[in-house]
Amino acid sequence: MYGGKSAEHNVSLQTALAVTKALNTEKFDIHPIYITEKGEWQRGPLLTEPVSNVKMLQLEQNGESFALSALNREMFPEASPDEKAPIDVVFPLLHGPNGEDGTIQGLLELLNVPYVGNGVLASSAGMDKVIMKHLFAQAGLPQAKYAAFLKKDWKQTPDSCLQQVEKELGYPCFVKPANLGSSVGISKCRNREELEKAFELAFEYDRKIVVEEGIAGREIEIGVLGNDEPKCSAVGEIAPKTDFYDYKAKYEDGDTDLMIPAQVTDEQYAEISEMAIKAFKAIDGSGLVRADFFLTNDGQVLINEVNTMPGFTPFSMFPLLWKEAGVDYSDLIEQLVELAKERHAEKQLIKHTF
């Protein structure tokens, strides 16, 4: 399931392209569900061979529209005309609001369909940077200083917002929409003029934003895989050649060095992996997250954020980290499918009467 009515629609398409190429069509029957940028749902024909380009995944022309009022019947048809097998697992490859924020996960929960990745709570907490940071603070995880603002506050008292940032965080700082990923709408600010423009830009994408102090150090990432007993991958380092790791560097020109494995000490790896699992549990994660850290110039490890649906594009860090740990791309996908089935089976044992 991919696409979506989101600023990260194209990111989702790139992720879906990579995943469909890696899936073993002899082992899996792949049914594409495409959500257009207008929010329309299209079901495509069974994929019998790897998809070669993104246009083949955009199903406006060769897909079949269906209404959400008939989800059980139309969205998940029989696996084939000759058998009554239900869909085994849904793999949501949706990024951003309405995709990795718990909404699609809630829909799949209502349908009682197994799905890959985090549940409603973890997805929504992982999408909202403000809530995420509150949970990290409660879990005792060290992180950069931050402040949150609503669009209402900005419109009513802009000077007060700017003064609060300057007093509590200083420059440089980063302004981000609270509920968006892939570095969309993010700005680095070195002065008040840039800060004011950054507020305006971020509020174009969300009604709530977060401002974080700038941290001098390295950007370190690690993959987490599992349910109640998660494990960690190798660590990687992001070294953007631009001022910071923005959307263009992530998905377009690849103008970023990904160093895998990152050069860290055994003690630092142990601390990063321990904090990553602690962050995973703080949001009640399942399936997968990519945990992002800062390693400051004085050696301190700070949690930045977790991504509950990290990209699977050719430039993406998550699958590369697991490849370094000895898990290839196809095997990684199969493990995620098994984790989804495991978590779903566990939920079926829960009592709903008393």
Swiss-Prot record:
One of its GO terms (biological process) is cell wall organization. Mg(2+) 1 binds at D292, E305. Transmembrane segments: none annotated. It catalyses: 2 D-alanine + ATP = D-alanyl-D-alanine + ADP + phosphate + H(+). It comes from Bacillus velezensis (strain DSM 23117 / BGSC 10A6 / LMG 26770 / FZB42). InterPro entries: ATP-grasp, ATP_grasp_subdomain_1, D-Ala_lig_Van_CS, D_ala_D_ala, Dala_Dala_lig_C, Dala_Dala_lig_N, PreATP-grasp_dom_sf. NCBIfam families: D_ala_D_alaTIGR, PRK01372.1, PRK01966.1-2, PRK01966.1-4. Pfam families: Dala_Dala_lig_C, Dala_Dala_lig_N. GO terms for cellular component: cytosol. It is an enzyme of class 6 (ligase). Binds 2 magnesium or manganese ions per subunit. Pathway: Cell wall biogenesis; peptidoglycan biosynthesis. Mg(2+) 2 binds at E305, N307. Cell wall formation. It is found in: Cytoplasm. Keywords: ATP-binding, Cell shape, Cell wall biogenesis/degradation, Cytoplasm, Ligase, Magnesium, Manganese, Metal-binding, Nucleotide-binding, Peptidoglycan synthesis. Its EC number is 6.3.2.4. Its cofactor is Mg(2+); Mn(2+). GO terms for molecular function: ATP binding; D-alanine-D-alanine ligase activity; metal ion binding. Belongs to the D-alanine--D-alanine ligase family. Residues 133-338 form the ATP-grasp domain. This is D-alanine--D-alanine ligase. The gene is ddl.
